[in-house]
Structures are given as structure tokens and as C-alpha cells.
Amino acid sequence: MKLQASWSLIAVALLAFRADADGTAWDLEIVPLKPGIYLLQRPEPLRQPVEGNVLVIVNERDVVVFEGGGMPIAADNAIRLIRSITSKPVSHLVNSHWHGDHNLGNQVYRAEYPGITIVAHPATRAAMLGPPFKYVTEFDKDVGPTITEWTALKEKGELSERRSRLLDDLNLLLTDAKRIAVTPPDLTVADELVLHRGEREIHIRHLGKGNTEGDLVLWLPRERIVATGDLVVHPIPYGFGSFPREWIDTLAGIEALDFELLVPGHGEVQRDRSYLELLRTMLAAMRVQAADAVAKGLDLEATRKALDFSAFAPKFPQDDMGKRLFEAWWTSPISRSLWLEASGKPIVQADAGENN
């Protein structure tokens, strides 16, 4: 997901924030997966601001990391944990796609590991250097008014505990945003790159469009682990600026891999194909509905109202927070992409966060 805080998402953030949440939104913990393979994961995947999973691959002489973190502080935390695992240097950092919650820590890795190679798809590099990344310079404009308002309420003792904790994260976000120096990849992969590390092969592949134009996955055939970026997000998918038809094919490509563990862009590791199949089935069904809506001449808003996700919604979190996040993160944005696709209109990445 594009890390943005032009917070109609403030309301969403409140939904996804527990008053008793521990630490900051960028704290991570180590989850060993297999020998030499570790997941750095935030315990609460639905918490805002969002923060993605980081896959760490410790080889004989170096370390390969998949995902650069959503803020400099996230990269600080990840590197601290990596160094608690090994003293070996990080040689390669892979960004799965252009959304900032996967790469705004790149410059921290570059500073800590000067010889590092940052890898991404050409479309990711273009987005990071172009209009889609304009929002990175606008955190103060987006978050500042809310911080000012809530700080005044807190001083008067009128701010709820939930908002007070979220205010702490927003202040930290705004402070840390001053450290951001957009650091695009210096090696781009349009199809596949294979890193050979002894008996280990690390495949970095573009299987097709999906969540964005330039999604990369990382595949470890010997260990049977695939990391998908935001092509798969659990327990609620992200649908911002996505490509429904191609996404179905890309998910099928992931499903065809002989994986044992699937590391999503956010959320819990998947140990079977059921969630992957759910996403693919849902996208296929909604494409049929969108085509029917457009054939009837419905515009975007009418199509949004006509699309019926009720057959799939019960398979996602059903508490009040889950239902609202399912609408904010999935049904509303993916409906736009479904309508654009069915109408034969282009899906432009720069528009992904502006017209959801």
C-alpha cells in the first residue's frame, strides 16, 4: 500500500489502532522460517500506518533482504534485528514495488551497507522518480493539521486514549519523514534475476502486473519459500491502483510454484494455497460483475454500488474494524480499477492514491 496519510485514512487509522498497542507502528520481531531464513514482521498487520514484512536471507558470505521498510525508522529497526542474527553484510536489497511502505528505508540500508545493490522492476524505479512519489514530500501538509488539532485536545485532557496513542505515531512519522531521501534501485529486473549463493538459488521474478505495474516476487526453490510483496496481503488485501485481469494471471503464476511457505507483503505467513485461491477467485468473479455494469452504461460510482462482494466478504475479518478496512483497502479501490479495466480506460499508477 502506498504509505499515505492524507487521512480520510486518519479515520481508518483509528479503526485499525488498539489503545493498548505496544511500541511504535514500525517495531518488528524476528520469526525464523527455515535455517538462514527469517521474517521480520510487525505483530499487528492491520495497524496504521501500515508496515510491510521483511524477508532476510542469510547466505555463506552475505545477506539478501526483500523489502526496504516503510520509513527510515523501520529500516533502523530491521537492520538492528539483522545484526542480532548475523554480522554478514547486506549485499542486495529488493523492493517488491513502488509503494513507499516497501522502500522508504532504502537510504538507511545504503548508508549502513555502502556496497549494497538495490533491486526493483523498471516500473518501480520510474514511479519512485516520477509523479507517484510526490506524496512523499507532503507528509506535513497531510498530517500536520490533525497533529495540531489533536495536540490541542490532548493538552486540555479531551483526547481519547486511542487517539493519544495514534498521535504519538503520527508525531514520530512526521519527524522521521524529514530523514527520507528517495533512493531508487540501481539494478532493474524486467523478467528474472537469479543470485547464486552456494547451493542456494534466489530467484527475483516479475510474473506480471497485479497490485502495481512492476511487482517482483522472490522465490527460493530449495527452501520452497515465496515472498510476494503486496500481490498477496493478509488478512485484508490492498486494491489501490491495481490491474485486475493481469493480477489473476500473476496469482496463478505464484500458485504454480512448488512453495511450502508464502510470505505476503503484510500479515501472517501462509502455509497453503487457500488464501491465494480466494484472492484469485474473488478477482475473477468481480471482473464479470464489472463487465456487466459497464455494459449497462454505469459510471464509476454506480458501478461501485452495483458490485456485490457479499459472497467473499465473510471470508475476511468480520468485526467492525475488519468490515470498514475491507471497504477502505479493498472494495472501494479495486472497484475503481475494475471499472476502468472494463471501460477500456488506462489504469495510471500516479492516480492510485488520488482517485480511490
Q: Where are the language model's segments positioned?
A:
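Active-site HxH/HxHxD metal-binding segment of metal-dependent hydrolases
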Residues: 83-185, 194, 288
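C-terminal regulatory/interaction regions
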Residues: 295-356
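Bacterial N-terminal signal peptides
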Residues: 7-16
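Active-site neighborhood of phospho(di)ester-bond hydrolases with catalytic His/Asp-centered motifs
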Residues: 66-68, 91-99, 119-122, 207, ...
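Core dinuclear metal-dependent hydrolase active-site scaffold
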Residues: 178-184, 188-220
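Conserved beta-strand hairpin/beta-sheet module of binuclear metal-dependent hydrolase folds
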Residues: 31-84, 216-230
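Boundary at the C-terminal end of the N-terminal hydrophobic targeting segment
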Residues: 16-25
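Divalent-metal (often Zn2+) His-rich catalytic cores of metallo-beta-lactamase-fold enzymes
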Residues: 225, 248-302
